Amino acid sequence: MKIAAAVLILLWLTVPVAAQQQHKPEMRAYSYLVYWKNARIGYQESTWKTETVDGEHRDTITDETYIKIKRSFDGTTFEIKESTSKVYGPDWKPLSQVNERSDGGQKTRTEVVYSEGMISVTEASGQGKPVKFEITLDGKNYMDDQQAFAKLKSEGRLKAQERLSFDAFSSSDKALVPCTWIVGQVATRKAKTGETLKGTSVSVVQGGARTELLLDDNGLPLWVWSSAMISAERVDKIPVPFEVESPPEIKSSMEANAVIPGDDTQIERMEIHFKFPVDDGDGVPPLLDSNSYHDVVRWEKGKQTGYAARLKSQRLPEDFKAPAFPLEKVDESAKKFLAATPMCESEDEVLAAKSADVVKKCKDARDAATALCKFVFRYLAKKSGNSGTATARQAYDEKKGDCTEHAALFVALARAAGLPARCVSGTVYLAGKDEAFWGYHAWSEVWLGRWVVVDATVNQVGVGARYLFFQYDEPGETEGSGRTARCLSNDFTPIIDAYRLKGRDEFRLENSKKFEFR
């Protein structure tokens, strides 16, 4: 549900510049209905309070959001409630922000303080200890969204083809991310309520994800659309009682065109392709990159476009030698993945004690990673927990979870044992006896002298060639952000062209396509 929350942030990204000129307290209220694939899934009620505090101008923006949605693979329905309050000083200078989020059984509180040259973030999930982050602004072209709108308006640049690029703060990524505003024409749009909305169209590309806006004369959103197929429209009021219109299912799996026989760890290579529109550019990265998981090429045939990938085995070589355990030396680039995060509470006393108990007899780092992977695989029941995405401690307490919880718990336990580890997301090929499918998936990587893939959901340290990499789901790691959302809004269905099992010749499917990989 991170997708939905990220989109709703854009509902308060612009506030009337005129409000900064007020001298007496004034309150404004705005309401929005939220949709996913044309089904009403929630709402947001926003208030803007303008006042003078100790002789200085203040604007406080408060948003109350509710969303309800359902997953396709298990039919689980989640309710998300979120409250955000942000305070601004003169010239839309951000001062502070507090966000409280309830996702099923999980509660998260995030506090942000803006100071000269620094953004400080403190976040705590459930009963976990608060985790602090500091983002340095030195040398950065940092700007808040409200400041960006005010700049465009004051300079007379709210007209077609005008662009403004800057570094924006992403509270979800705990990092500065590139942001570009591209101003379009004055446009009209028919709302789902039947009302005609008219305003200035603006395309916002932030952190690799694109969002389309329709703004009124004061810069307030009339309509919002994201690449995740989530949209919002301003309305006069929220219906009472509010009812969700048949919560839509998030399509989390796609049927595969072939069942590869045998043990999936023995897949040494797999070639696939899929149709996908050209949706990158202007700061949006390609959907796939060539990396240790796969080689990638883009293809075009007539009006059709897409990607082809040659997936590589991630199994450990037979002569792999892991460093002794506990680790005595860690690469500088891997050290940051030893720190606790709100999702992976490696400093939690209960998790730290369990980690120490699991690895107490391990002699090398591979043995330790294998023991932790095996523990997580056996400990967590393979079913959804009480929230869309649980923290490691919450998953441990509930003793259940899907792939996301397996990855988070493994990473937390590995870090507690002194092994750098990180969460990864993408898609994976899974096969049974008679059927196979591709599913959105989360797994881990652990540093054993080099990065090694770990999938605790299936108890594998080192995996076969069946993973498509999207991004690292860690604070500060923004590369690839938004890729899952882009797949959800398009008909993303990988087609297997060929594969090779260990010790066997390549098998190419009938009528398959062949691409030249570098």
List PLM regions with ranges.
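Sec/Tat signal peptide C-region and signal peptidase I cleavage site
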Residues: 15-19
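Bacterial N-terminal signal peptides
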Residues: 4-14
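Acidic, serine/threonine-rich low-complexity disordered tracts
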Residues: 20-118, 122, 135, 154-319, ...
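Active-site-proximal structural scaffolding
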Residues: 365, 369, 403-407, 437-440, ...
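Active-site rim recognition segments
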Residues: 236-238, 243-244, 329, 419, ...
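Cysteine-centered nucleophilic/redox motifs
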Residues: 372, 399-427, 444
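Secondary-structure boundary elements
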Residues: 145-148, 317, 322-401, 476, ...
